[in-house]
Amino acid sequence: KIITKIFKTGGEIAYKNLKRSKKKYRTTVISIIVSVVIFIAISSFIQYGFKMSSAYYTEKNYNYVVYARTAEILTDISNLPDIGEYSINKSNIFEMNMDDKHKSELTEYGKNIKNRYYAEDKNGNLIDNINIISLNKSSYENYVKNIGGNYETYKDGAILVDNNINVDDNGKRIQGSMYTWKKGDTVTGKIDDKEYSIKIVSKTEERPNGVENLYNTEAYFIVSEEFINKTGFKSAALYAQSNDTDKLDEEVEQYKTENSFTNSDLNAFNMEESIRAENAVVLVISIFLYGFIGVITLIGITNIFNTITTNMNLRKKEFA
């Protein structure tokens, strides 16, 4: 009676058919549910795939990276016609002894990270490392301006970037600051076995180009080119925002050939090309998965129509 009131005559007939052939109707319902669930699951997976394939690149302010044996090579590359806006980053390691004083300067988050990922010097003593990265003058001036600073005030000190993201032992994402240091503090450590005292002129979460990789166990000191030229550096890289990365590829290859450089001397990474390659792979997977969804959906729809048609033919009198 309730079904008749709500769904009228059609509902009553459907209910009778359900009672007569429960297995067939369960199969029909299951087919519908499975088709919908698979469609939603695979669609979400494909969207996630596209998102993840480009997330690493699209969040950056550069689309071309060059690694070279010397900073002079990078300076030459910076003069190529299609280089666009660029930043030349030089880097080194600032090493500190993990003594009681330094441990007291770590936050609880920092202690957790350092206990899990510790480093040792050549004598087996526990140490803590901070990446020192310099920017060429124009890039450093723009960076300092963006964080509300002044070049002349900041050029002899270090800007602390200390917003770390990592994963715990359970694979859960964790985030925090590793040090209790603040603006005006002085930190003592070694660069290439020579002792230096570095004054922290600012603390920020804003990262310059080339310092976007958050999954690490170390913080960063961002310094001027003048500063790192005094202390020395181990490696250098150029980060560019080019309007035509394919043309820039050709120009870099030509420069490489003219100077008889090998990949160990000069290596370029076209991020636009990588995005295209990854998206092509995801597209092929998408076509396959959507084809699979189509087959499953077609089977489900066929089952539904077959069941409905069969039952209608068997119960023509009731419909009449």
Descriptions of predicted regions:
Residues 51-292:
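Basic-flanked hydrophobic alpha-helices used for secretion and membrane insertion
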Residues 4, 39, 174-177, 241, ...:
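Hydrophobic alpha-helical scaffolding
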Residues 17-21, 56, 304, 311:
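Histidine kinase transmitter module recognition
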Residues 28-38, 286-306:
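Alpha-helical transmembrane segments of integral membrane proteins
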Residues 24-26, 34-62:
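Alpha-helical transmembrane segments
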Residues 1-30:
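Feature of multi-pass inner-membrane transport and sensor proteins
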Residues 17-18, 278, 285, 315:
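Intracellular alpha-helical coupling/juxtamembrane segments of multi-pass membrane proteins
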Residues 300-320:
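Interfacial "coupling" helices/loops that link adjacent transmembrane helices in transporter permeases
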